[in-house]
Amino acid sequence: MSRFFATGTDSESESSSEDEPVVRAPAPVYTFSDDEEETKRVVRSMKEKRYEELEGIIHSIRNHRKIKDFSSALASFEELQKAYTRAAPVVQKEENGVAPRFFIRALVELDDWVVGAWNEREARKALSKGNSKALTSLRQKLRKYTKDFEAEISXFREDPDLPDDNERKDSSSSDESEDEEKPIKEKPKPEPLLRPPPEDDESSDSMDWASSSSDSSFSSDDEERGTSNIREQFIKKVTKKEDDEEKIKLKLKKREERRERSGKINKRDVADDGGEWETVRKGAATSDKPKMFAKDSDIDAALVVKKLGEISAARGRKRTDRRAQLELLHELRTVALQHNLGDALQLKLRSAIVAALFDYNPKVSDAMKPEYWSKLVENIDHMVTLLLAHEDMVLSETILEENEQLVTPPYQVRGCLLTYLERLDDEFTKLLKECDPHSNEYVERLKDEVRVSALIDRVCQVVERDGTPQEICRAYLRKIDHLYYKFDPRAVRKDLPPTEETTIKKMERYCKYIYAHDETDRLRTRAILSHIYHHALHDNWFQARDLLLMSHLQETVQHSDPSTQILYNRTMANLGLCAFRRGNVKEAHGCLAELMMTGKPKELLAQGLLPQRQHERSKEQEKIEKQRQMPFHMHINLELLECVYLVSAMLIEIPYMAAHEFDARRRMISKTFYQNLRASERQALVGPPESMREHAVAAARAMRRGDWRACLNYIVNEKMNAKVWDLMVGADNVRAMLGRLIREESLRTYLFTYAHVYASLSLRSLADMFELPRQRVHSLVSKMIINEELLASLDDPSECAILHRSEPTRMQALALQLADKVGNLVDSNERIFEKQGSFFQRGGAQRGEGRQRERPREGWNRRTRNRRRDDERADD
């Protein structure tokens, strides 16, 4: 039989079809997925690519404009210029060199935004340094760049509402693409009617009927695919509607799997015959409450404690879900509350919740999340409420779990409330250090300090009732840490009633208890330093000074821990400020000298790390030092410290330099001030002072000339008031004190410098010259005469100071200075000669023989000469 009749028709007999084997076309062994069939490759032109790049950058610039991010806008504008340069060939070819309208629109909008921001002077002053610099640079670059598009920009400003060219083209192209993508609906072919095969004699009729109905389908299949299997024609075909339903079900199933993996589905009930969709809620996925106990179990305190032990046993393990553990503990506490199992059990469960909250943060060095910290405060506050409400309830770490009493009073629960409080306070400090100190977030976090202080007060009540003296000392020290750096204006009032308790009285009570009952030196040391700091903050100079001298902390503080050393540095800095406010300049300089001469007061006060010293420490050391930093609201103004130090050094150093001008052995009192003064004197041209340090140096040079008015104007002016003096308590008194001290020290400098010119000086003239009371001038001159700083005598009837000529003139002083230097040179040469021996000797004698015999004689001559010179100096 020919192969063209292999497929045959229904009209042929079965015997003829069985004689020849049917040759079938091989079926393909691969299939195409629906995604591959639906995906179409899109070919874009160069114009579309370049324009899409420009539109993306313009979109980012608009986002930067919304948030007023000038730095990012500048970077995006520079990127836009580069992108337009790359698109220039396309613009030249497609647009005849005319810039597209959407690009011109972006330039105009950016220019209007920059001009508006530049004209708002107040808002521009409030910008950060980086944003202000970026705004200036962006304005200059934009003005320069838009000069090439002046014609297009002017045309755009005439009719800005006209739509962009690319938008019209996009809309037209999208319409065309939609028209092209509309499928041509074909007329559906009628499906063959299928019915079950008839019995016996009806079989031949049925086969004839089927063949007549399927001739057209066979012919179409043969044309498309060649040969086909006859059996496939009788299989039930899937209609288009059923196929669409299958695709929809498949898409829904895939979407469900994706949502389940991302955790966005709230709940889905699955049954044998299918499931139902539920509403998706915002936020994290929620789950059913964990089942604690069986339905029929009798819940009592022992069962709850057993369940608590099972939950706590997983604490600290590697794969423990901390969030799930917290949920279990909360559910367990709810169950105990529903069954009314007692407040002691509630206290134990809350203690476990607090411990779990502390464990939730895996890294101890990182700050806790604010929401979890708030939960900590709430739970600890509830614990304190329970303890204050039940006097027969004790929470202590000395109680063993076997000895706990949770059902019958007196209740005994294992735990340590004071440890929880200390951890809570430390986490609060970490939260403050993590925030930007110049943001509103820091202010919001700082408001929680009131909650922490109130909680510490309540914990102190519990500890005073049930705790040991050492625990009371720990609680009081936490209260002191939140109290010592705060200024209380009531404490400086003189009309305050004696019954009202100020912070000074509170500090006195807390510190005295620690002095008497502390068993460790650390708590006592920190209490003393905090007490000194608080006294100095309220200008109690003598109390603070006496407490420091009696404690001898300056001798042992170098052996303390770093946090105590930081507190010592802060205390000395504040003590120096207190001494300066009280007019004790020498004491202020002594307190601040060791801190400021190191050149790194910022690090010593734990107020930040210097970037230029990063190579001196490793990453671990830097991490540790950052953990020791103080919160921003506890910082001491470094510029204020430096100004006080420089002014104190000026008031001490300038009169001393005038008194010992020709002394070769003169020592420097303040090395830092001396270096700044020498650097200023070496400059050929000295401009007007700008910084605080330049003001102090200019004032020192004016005082050295005796011009006290210029000196006072350099120290006290509007700029210095805003930067320094207005930051002090009692700024007006400080400025008045500065004026008095500058006049007095200028008078002393004048007398030291020009005393050799006068035979006598009128005290009344000096008082008028320096605008000081005559009694004060008389006191200063008398003190200088008594201290042998000024060789003179006072004539009371004439109110004059008679100067004596016993001191050498300038020429004599220079000659004496030269003689001292020559004598030192001779001594040094003789020592070198003695050390080298007779190696410089010429002659026939052996090396070293003659000089070795002469050495004792030479040493005796040198000693005699030195003794004679010392005697002459003593006689002078």
Curated annotation (Swiss-Prot):
InterPro entries found in the cross-reference section: EIF3C, EIF3C_N_dom, PCI_dom, WH_DNA-bd_sf
One GO location term (cellular component): eukaryotic 43S preinitiation complex
Domain named PCI: residues: 632-808
Protein name: Eukaryotic translation initiation factor 3 subunit C
Record keywords: Cytoplasm, Initiation factor, Protein biosynthesis
Gene: eIF3-S8
Protein purpose: Component of the eukaryotic translation initiation factor 3 (eIF-3) complex, which is involved in protein synthesis of a specialized repertoire of mRNAs and, together with other initiation factors, stimulates binding of mRNA and methionyl-tRNAi to the 40S ribosome. The eIF-3 complex specifically targets and initiates translation of a subset of mRNAs involved in cell proliferation.
Subunit structure: Component of the eukaryotic translation initiation factor 3 (eIF-3) complex.
Record has Cytoplasm as a keyword: yes
PROSITE patterns in the record: PCI
GO biological process, one term: formation of cytoplasmic translation initiation complex
Region called Disordered, residue ranges: 1-25, 154-233, 839-876
Biased composition (Low complexity): 206-219
Biased composition (Acidic residues): 11-20
Record-linked Pfam families: eIF-3c_N (PF05470), PCI (PF01399)
PANTHER family from the UniProt entry: EUKARYOTIC TRANSLATION INITATION FACTOR 3, SUBUNIT 8 EIF3S8 -RELATED, EUKARYOTIC TRANSLATION INITIATION FACTOR 3 SUBUNIT C-RELATED
Subcellular location: Cytoplasm
Compositionally biased tracts (Basic and acidic residues): 154-172, 182-192, 848-861
Species: Bombyx mori
Family, as annotated: Belongs to the eIF-3 subunit C family.
SMART domains according to UniProt: PINT
Entry GO MF terms: RNA binding; translation initiation factor activity; translation initiation factor binding
